[in-house]
Structures are given as C-alpha cells and as structure tokens.
C-alpha cells in the first residue's frame, strides 16, 4: 500500500542537502562562465519533444491531457532546450550559452533496478559550429568536476561521424550497421566480433572491422586510424580538438576511443563520456548534436553535456566530509521565552540552531547524537563534540 511507483525514489534530508550543495556550487561555477540557467516544463508534447528525443519510446512516461493530446514527462533536457532556443532565444542572440539543473524521467522495467527520475546538471552551447565550442564544452565539464572536488576521472572522446563512416564502408547493409552500433553502445566487443563473423563479409572488410575495434579503443595519435577512414574533415577536426585540450592543460584526463557510441542517437559529431572511480556507469556524457535543431526548424550548430547528479554523489561518497556544526537548544515548557532568546541569538551569529521541547523527545540520546552542540536552557552547555 505504501510502495512508491516503479523506479521512483525518496530523497532523504542528508542526501537532499548534498544535492543542493552540488546545485549551488554548479550554478555559481557555470554562471561565472557566461551560462544562463533555464527551466523548461516537466511535461511536453509527445509529437514534438517526445519524438525528437533520442530516448526509446518504451522508456517515455506518457499521459493524455483533457484535450486528448499525448504528453510526455521530459526524458532529457537537451531536446526541450533545443525547442526553446529555436522558437525564441536564437532570435535574440547567437550563440546561446544555457545551463540547467533539473529532473528527467525515464520509465523502467521491473528488473532494471534503475531510477525512473533523476537530476541532471549540464550546459548547451547553441549557435556555434566550431571546434572551439566543442573544446569549451569538454573543458567546462572537466573543470566543473574538479571544482566539485572530483579529481579521479577520465573523459573518453569519440566521433559519431567517423564511426558511422567506418561502419558504412565495411558492412553491406543498414541492418548490419545498426546491429554493430547497438553492440558498441553496450560495449559488447565479444558480441561485435561474433556479429562480424556471422555477416559473412568479404575477408578484407571483416578483418578491417575487427582490427579497427582493437586499435580504436585507446588511440594515442588520431592519425593512427587514418587508414580505416575515407578522407574527411572529421579527423582533422579531432586533431584540432586534441590540440586545444592540450593547450587547456587537461590532456592527462582525456583518452580517444573511436568505437564510442551512444544511445542518444542525435549526436552527429564529437561525443564524450565521463568515467570516475566509484561509479560503475558513466558519470556524464555530451557531444555535438547539430541535427536535433533541424527538427525544430533551425540549422544552428549545438553542443553540450550533462552530469548525472546521483552518480556524482555516489562517486563523492566516502571522500572526507566535515560534519556541519549544529546546535540544539533544549527547553522545558516554562523556559520557552528564555529558549527563544537563546536560539535567536545563536541564529543571528550565523549558527545552525534547532529549538526543541525536551518532553517531546522519545529517545533523547539518539536525537542529540545528530548535533555537535547541546544547550539546555537554565543549565550550562552540557555537551559538544
């Protein structure tokens, strides 16, 4: 009777405070870098945002309004922001630097064990097609994580266009390309090899695909994969991106993996994922999604990233934390006025202070354990830790 809907979670006070700390720190950091925060509705039209989103239809929360329109709870923030930018903001200024901290919703299967609602923090840089915009997004993501006191992380960068080109050149059907791309999304390299064998491709093509997968997962020099790719500007673009990240003194955090593929199908160019010690899943991801804005009638370039706040907190968990100083003022009924004066004095001094009637406590010892200082009105301070 008292169960929550599948995939929904309660946020208890201690976690809530940590989430708010991340929100405030992130907002201050991103605002100082020229990003303006935006909020979009939790509910959007299925025919626009729902269909444009890269989230599978089976993972959308759908509902119907009183006029019979099919709606969805927003499954991501990039698509709603693309809607807002193309309909209004890009008419005011180009490029747009937008930021957000919001919940997104994705329906889960019973055995999935994953949250159906979670917070994301991220940015979208809309209206700039240059490699410098992609570099800015990656650098901002890394510097944000460092600002949040996360040092042990890696950023893996790939390119959707280069991977698509290779799959097109070395397979013989769209179905084969889709199969291999799906296996790469799930990092199922054994399955990839088995699929290539099952396609009965010409030996030269099959060997090239398997050799590419082996070499492309940890590329030291982007020129090493030139032999697999038809001449195109994407390789030059990625070489420029690598140089810009070196100039930002962040190359030590970066690896290039040209097998990287995402379930977010709107990525058209550079894409990346952030991995950190302490989390079994990517902490965040981002990339260039120029094609998404065309759905809303604009040809402006766009790039961005998002961080999963719950996974960030899991990663930060265990790092040294100082307990926040908190005082409780205990009083008996006849001491209320004196207790009120005392607690207001503490609060005016900037302290976190709670006022508590002593007779209402069921387990005084357990209650007081949550405070670093205890003041009993009418007595001297009786405890501090």
UniProtKB/Swiss-Prot annotation:
Keyword Amino-acid biosynthesis: yes
Location of this chain's protein in the cell: Cytoplasm
Pathway: Amino-acid biosynthesis; L-histidine biosynthesis; L-histidine from 5-phospho-alpha-D-ribose 1-diphosphate: step 1/9
GO annotations of cellular component type: cytoplasm
Cystine connections: none
One of the GO BP terms on file: histidyl-tRNA aminoacylation
Gene Ontology MF terms: catalytic activity, acting on a protein; histidine-tRNA ligase activity; transferase activity
Function: Required for the first step of histidine biosynthesis. May allow the feedback regulation of ATP phosphoribosyltransferase activity by histidine.
Other facts: This function is generally fulfilled by the C-terminal part of HisG, which is missing in some bacteria such as this one.
NCBIfam families given in the database record: hisZ_biosyn_reg, PRK12292.2-4
Similarity comment: family membership: Belongs to the class-II aminoacyl-tRNA synthetase family. HisZ subfamily.
Subunit structure: Heteromultimer composed of HisG and HisZ subunits.
Protein name as annotated: ATP phosphoribosyltransferase regulatory subunit
Organism: Lysinibacillus sphaericus (strain C3-41)
Gene from which this protein is expressed: hisZ
């Amino acid at each position: 009777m008292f169960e929550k809907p599948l995939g929904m979670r309660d946020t208890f006070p201690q976690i809530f405070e940590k989430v708010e700390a991340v929100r405030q720190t992130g907002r201050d950091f991103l605002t100082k870098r020229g990003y303006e925060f935006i909020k979009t509705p939790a509910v959007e039209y299925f025919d626009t945002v729902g269909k444009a989103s890269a989230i599978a239809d089976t993972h959308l929360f759908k509902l119907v309004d009183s006029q019979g329109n099919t709606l969805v709870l927003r499954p991501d923030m990039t698509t709603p922001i693309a809607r807002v930018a193309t309909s209004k903001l890009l008419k005011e200024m180009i490029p747009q630097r937008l930021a957000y901290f919001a919940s997104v919703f994705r329906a889960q299967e019973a055995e999935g064990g994953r949250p159906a609602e979670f917070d994301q923090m991220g940015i979208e840089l809309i209206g700039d097609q240059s490699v410098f915009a992609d570099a800015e997004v990656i650098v901002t993501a890394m510097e944000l994580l460092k600002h949040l006191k996360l040092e042990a992380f890696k950023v893996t960068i790939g390119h959707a266009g280069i991977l698509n080109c290779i799959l097109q050149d070395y397979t013989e059907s769209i179905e084969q390309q889709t199969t291999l791309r799906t296996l790469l999304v799930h990092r199922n390299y054994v399955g990839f090899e088995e699929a290539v064998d099952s396609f009965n491709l010409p030996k030269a093509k099959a060997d090239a695909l398997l050799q590419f997968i082996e070499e492309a997962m940890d590329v030291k020099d982007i020129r090493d994969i030139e032999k697999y790719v038809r001449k195109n500007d994407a390789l030059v673009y990625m070489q420029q991106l690598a140089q810009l990240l070196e100039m930002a003194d962040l190359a030590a955090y970066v690896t290039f993996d040209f097998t990287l593929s995402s379930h977010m199908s709107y990525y058209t160019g550079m894409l990346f994922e952030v991995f950190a010690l302490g989390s079994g899943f990517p902490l965040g991801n981002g990339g260039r999604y120029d094609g998404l804005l065309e759905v809303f009638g604009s040809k402006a370039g766009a790039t961005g990233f998002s961080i999963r706040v719950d996974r960030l907190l899991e990663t930060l968990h265990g790092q040294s934390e100082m307990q926040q100083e908190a005082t409780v003022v205990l009083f008996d009924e006849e001491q209320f006025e004196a207790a009120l004066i005392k607690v207001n004095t503490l609060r005016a001094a900037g302290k976190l202070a709670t006022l508590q009637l002593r007779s209402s406590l069921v387990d005084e010892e357990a209650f007081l354990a949550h405070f670093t200082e205890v003041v009993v009105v009418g007595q001297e301070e009786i405890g501090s830790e």
